[in-house]
Swiss-Prot record:
GO BP annotations listed: response to hydrogen peroxide
Enzyme Commission number(s): 1.7.99.1
A Gene Ontology cellular-component term: cytoplasm
Name of the protein in question: Hydroxylamine reductase
Recorded superkingdom: Bacteria
UniProt modified residues of type Cysteine persulfide: 398
GO molecular function: 4 iron, 4 sulfur cluster binding; hydroxylamine reductase activity; metal ion binding; peroxidase activity
Reaction(s) the record says it catalyses: A + NH4(+) + H2O = hydroxylamine + AH2 + H(+)
């Protein structure tokens, strides 16, 4: 087994015996085989694009199946086998349309489904590239492929909402093809990684456009953290479209719907809240706490995307997955006439007790996306000019189980009272319910949204830079980023593409980044690891 794609890799050096995420070596091998087949499909897709043959089916499939290979998404070996079979079907269909061409061995690769796909996957592990490549090029290849996985996930969600851009699909397919090239040097691979970052910026823009055109621009909204009496369904993940579909199917059933994890920002979308008043509150915190939180939740639970952990027996019967998410023997929701059928979830929720007690009211506020913040840009600019606001800190990203992630809580607690904290993604659950007060009517803690709402953070940063007529690196903003999985890698590549400097990254640096690549990032972008809250705060504030 070889996997270095997440922050919690074994001993910080990669998983080689069993995945820290809970993924077995067998599942990992079949997952690697899928990625290998996708690399072969990509070469055919690019030829088809040159010939003006439609590749939309292949592009969408590539995004979904890459999404499935991300950390904490799919643990089901059978599902990966299905993806491989479908990959080959799409590939051969495109080849038939292209006619007789001289295809590479990879484009003609055919696994033997009568023999172990595990052993065949082990034969095409990414680790084998390391044995024949320069370590630094291998490092950047891993950066590119892990970044493309994150890019594919955002592209998948944007496409669900009717937002697509062929140039994004092109970058995904070109990057997959590049993995098997041996003629590219270090500078070429730096350029490829930055191109992934540029495409990811476009994908996040498309997703933002899909969300806001469908559900309205987020507005500041108070979200209850205490449940109300009655039957309940909990929805976790990132997929707001599937949350909306569930809300439509649960209307007038008496069931209350709660968000979990990265779906907290859904409460800020006005059209969603106005149309579905039974979208009531938020339950729980970040993904790594789900085994305790799901066990206590007295209703049905739906996982729309990552992060799924290996489920415990005491709640697996009420857990449902959909889309790219999967786990062997766990209920899977099927698509009927192009839409997910949530009736099994509704039936399960109605069979369970639901909440029978209420607790003391608590709430948090969401909805501070770019439209909201930039609408008060004059207030922000004046407060900065008058010295009432000294500095902005973006403290956010992924959460995880490591104790050293307490750094982010302590950092926010130590931020001076004349500074504002922007946050996003599940890293916010370390401090999302803290009462930090306000400056000039502006909350000192603003939740920008999901991880893909890094787009909002970028829009806000560029807006402030424009207001002061300076570069984005000259505004009083520091990026204190926590990472865990491949979406965070894609976002980091986007920030580097934009030339953003002095990013502090933690809690540890990626295992796939070689010493020389790290030195390049440090020298070029001043990318640096977090140290202690006190030291980093002092350095940021000068």
């Amino acid at each position: 087994m070889f996997c270095e794609q997440c922050e919690q890799t074994a001993s910080g050096n990669g998983c080689h015996q069993w995945g820290a995420c809970g993924k077995s070596p067998e599942v990992n091998a079949v997952q690697d085989l899928l990625v290998y087949c996708l690399r072969g499909l990509a070469s055919v897709v690019l030829k088809a694009k040159e010939a003006a043959i439609s590749t939309r089916e292949a592009d969408i499939f590539t995004c979904e199946s890459l999404f499935a290979t991300m950390t904490n998404v799919n643990f089901d070996q059978r599902r990966f086998t299905d993806y491989i079979q479908r990959c080959l079907e799409i590939r051969e269909n495109l080849k038939a349309q292209l006619g007789s061409l001289d295809w590479s061995a990879l484009a003609n690769y055919q696994p033997n489904f009568n023999e172990s796909l595990v052993s065949q996957g082990q034969e095409v592990s990414l680790e084998l590239i390391e044995k024949v490549q320069d370590l630094d090029i291998f490092s950047l290849k891993l950066t590119a492929i892990y970044g493309v996985k994150g890019l594919a996930s955002y592209t998948f969600h944007a496409q669900e909402l009717g937002q697509e851009d062929d140039s994004v699909y092109q970058v995904i397919q070109e990057t997959l093809v590049a993995i098997d090239r041996s003629d590219l040097n270090l500078n070429d691979w730096v350029a490829i990684c930055l191109k992934v970052g540029a495409a990811n910026l476009r994908a996040m823009e498309l997703l933002d456009q899909g969300h806001t055109e469908t559900y309205g621009h987020p507005i500041p909204t108070n979200v209850p953290l205490n449940p109300r009496l009655g039957k309940a369904i909990l929805v976790s993940g990132h997929d707001i479209k599937q949350l909306a579909a569930l809300l439509a199917q649960t209307a007038n059933t008496g069931i209350t719907v709660y968000t979990h994890g990265e779906l907290l920002p859904a409460h800020g979308y006005p059209k969603l809240k106005e149309k579905y008043p039974h979208l009531y509150g938020h339950y729980g915190t970040a993904w790594q706490n789900q085994t305790k939180e799901f066990a206590k939740f007295p209703g049905a639970i739906v996982l729309t995307t990552n992060c799924l952990m290996p489920p415990h027996e005491n709640y697996e019967s009420k857990l449902f997955t959909l889309g790219p998410v999967g786990y062997a023997h766990i209920n899977r929701l099927e698509t009927v006439d192009g839409a997910i059928d949530f009736s099994p979830v509704i039936a399960k929720a109605q069979s369970l007790l639901g909440f029978t007690e209420i607790s003391e009211p608590r709430q948090v506020m969401v909805g501070f996306a770019h439209n909201t913040v930039l609408s008060v840009a004059d207030t922000v600019v004046n407060a900065l000019k008058q010295g009432k606001i000294r500095h902005f800190f973006l403290v956010g990203g992924c959460d995880g189980a490591k104790p050293d992630r307490n750094y982010y809580t302590e950092f926010v607690e130590q931020v001076p009272e004349d500074c504002i904290v922007l946050t996003l993604a599940c890293g916010k659950f370390r401090f999302f319910d803290k009462q930090l007060g306000s400056i000039e009517g502006l909350p000192r803690l603003m939740d920008l949204g999901q991880c893909n709402d890094a787009y909002s953070a970028i829009k806000i940063a560029l807006g402030l830079a424009n207001a002061f007529n300076v570069s984005v690196n000259e505004i009083p903003l520091s990026l204190i980023i926590s990472w865990y999985e491949q979406k965070a890698i894609a976002v980091l590549l986007t920030l580097l593409h934009l030339g953003m400097q002095n990013i502090r990254l933690g809690p540890t640096l990626p295992a796939f980044i070689s010493p020389n690549v790290l030195k390049f990032l440090s020298d070029t972008y001043h990318l640096q690891p977090i140290t202690t809250p006190a030291k980093d705060l002092a350095d940021c504030l000068g």
